[in-house]
């Protein structure tokens, strides 16, 4: 079994029912929809296809809505053709609505002239092109000198390292997209360019305003700004999970700082028992090639050794030539890394004293699984918290997570080592054990006489945290 979960971005290369089924068979656990691209009609069609295929295959596939956030981009180009920017030439970025050419391009951010000053760096297209600000004119035009030129295409990202950008954390577009996501009942929402805890609090308030029932939707904070690292602990405290978004992070920071930032973020998430996804360019060469580079393979494995819960594919599945092969490769790398994780894992389960019974029981169950030849740990949960806490202890056996809640069932597909089961509500310990045995005997190699560990909150008729642990022999009443 593979414990690390795989997030796949859905796009033109994989948005048919046939391709989605192949992604699921290859190992996809979560489908990401990137709201920087596409219309609501496009996303609604993809969601409908994902739901149909997942139901047909009887597989719990969560949907992650990734909001664009305050991304600053260049505008359109004359005749929609790329232009070549040459080193040393002057180039203007303007808020005026003009078609772009080799002399100027417009930007989606009207506040750019007010935020930058002479000497500031402007990076285009994930840092591939670099400009230096020389002056600002008329409140609309930023005159720059091209430091590192290259080919500029339409709608490319603009990064401003070291510049305090006064963009809102939740844009009008984000609010419209969030309302759409609530309507579509997505399982997770990712917020881009989180800089402080208040950014996460803002989107949580927006969810409540849209629909009080949507308040439980977990928020994944994408950490891609230096300010996010300055406020790391407070962001992780309020978010339900975090994403190591290495694309923009690697532009805002020096590239050599990104591996350290990745380890810091993963460590903080695990210490606080929050979900963490590692993303961006993990198998980037597979957009065009059927096999990855050796460096990419090592990158995926090292993220797993660092303690990530999930790894993510972006362009590899959304627009690449080898989407299915990319997922298969990601799954095989994860399985191989997990086979050696005991030797190379670089983090340890937090061992602090706790007054939380569910945390103490999760630790005890994980230690018991190491000491005895149990086949699995079964946990009953309504919200998914018990499964998530147990996942963060990194037991050496699968976690079978039983829930009567359909949304929790899907959301648990993002949790490391968790196999979700949707079952009727259990009103007694005997019913719980019956659910466990039915699942084991139907879907696993566990056989009568072997042992599993059960964690639950008793009495099951009340919503209580885990307070009960049992070492159970399968087939023995």
Which residues does each predicted region cover?
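Non-catalytic helical/linker scaffolds that mediate oligomerization, partner binding
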Residues: 1-477
């Amino acid at each position: 079994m593979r414990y690390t979960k795989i997030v796949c971005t859905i796009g033109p290369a994989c948005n048919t029912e046939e391709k989605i089924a192949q992604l699921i068979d290859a190992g996809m656990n979560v489908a990401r929809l990137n709201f920087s691209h596409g219309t609501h009609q496009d996303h609604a069609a993809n969601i409908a296809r994902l739901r149909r295929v997942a139901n047909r295959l009887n597989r719990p596939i969560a949907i992650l809505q990734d909001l664009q956030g305050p991304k600053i981009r260049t505008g359109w180009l004359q005749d929609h053709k790329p232009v070549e920017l040459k080193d040393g030439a002057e180039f203007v970025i303007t808020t005026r609505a003009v078609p772009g050419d080799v002399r100027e391009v417009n930007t989606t951010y009207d506040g750019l002239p007010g935020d930058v000053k002479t000497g500031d760096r402007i990076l285009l297209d994930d840092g591939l092109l670099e400009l230096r600000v020389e002056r600002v004119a008329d409140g609309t035009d930023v005159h720059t000198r091209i430091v590192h030129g290259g080919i500029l295409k339409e709608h490319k990202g603009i990064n401003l390292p070291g510049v305090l950008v006064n963009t809102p954390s939740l844009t009008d577009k984000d609010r419209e997209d969030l309302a759409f996501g609530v309507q579509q009942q997505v399982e997770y929402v990712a917020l881009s360019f989180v800089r402080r805890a208040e950014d996460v609090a803002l989107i949580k308030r927006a969810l409540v305003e849209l629909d009080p029932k949507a308040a439980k939707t977990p928020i994944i904070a994408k950490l891609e700004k230096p300010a996010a690292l300055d406020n790391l602990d407070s962001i992780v405290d309020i978010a339900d999970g975090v994403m190591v978004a290495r694309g923009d992070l690697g532009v805002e920071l020096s590239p050599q700082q990104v591996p350290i930032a990745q380890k810091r973020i993963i460590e903080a998430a695990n210490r606080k028992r929050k979900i963490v996804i590692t993303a961006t360019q993990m198998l980037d060469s597979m957009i065009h090639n059927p096999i990855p580079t050796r460096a990419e393979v090592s990158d995926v494995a090292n993220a797993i050794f660092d303690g990530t819960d999930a790894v993510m594919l972006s362009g590899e599945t959304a627009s690449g030539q080898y989407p299915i092969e990319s997922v298969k490769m990601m799954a095989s790398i994860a399985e191989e890394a997990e086979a050696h994780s005991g030797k190379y894992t670089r983090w340890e389960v937090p061992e602090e004293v706790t007054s939380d019974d569910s945390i103490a029981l999760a630790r005890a169950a994980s230690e018991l699984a190491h000491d005895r030849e149990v086949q699995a740990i079964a946990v009953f949960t309504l919200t998914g918290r018990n499964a998530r806490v147990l996942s963060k202890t990194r037991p050496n056996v699968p976690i079978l997570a039983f829930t009567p809640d359909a949304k929790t069932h899907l959301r648990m597909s993002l949790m490391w080592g968790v196999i979700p089961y949707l079952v009727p509500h259990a009103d007694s310990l005997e019913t719980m054990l019956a659910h466990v045995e039915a699942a084991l005997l139907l879907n696993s190699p566990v056989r009568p006489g072997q042992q599993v560990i059960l964690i639950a909150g008793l009495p099951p008729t009340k919503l209580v945290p885990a307070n009960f642990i049992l070492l159970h022999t399968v087939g023995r009443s």
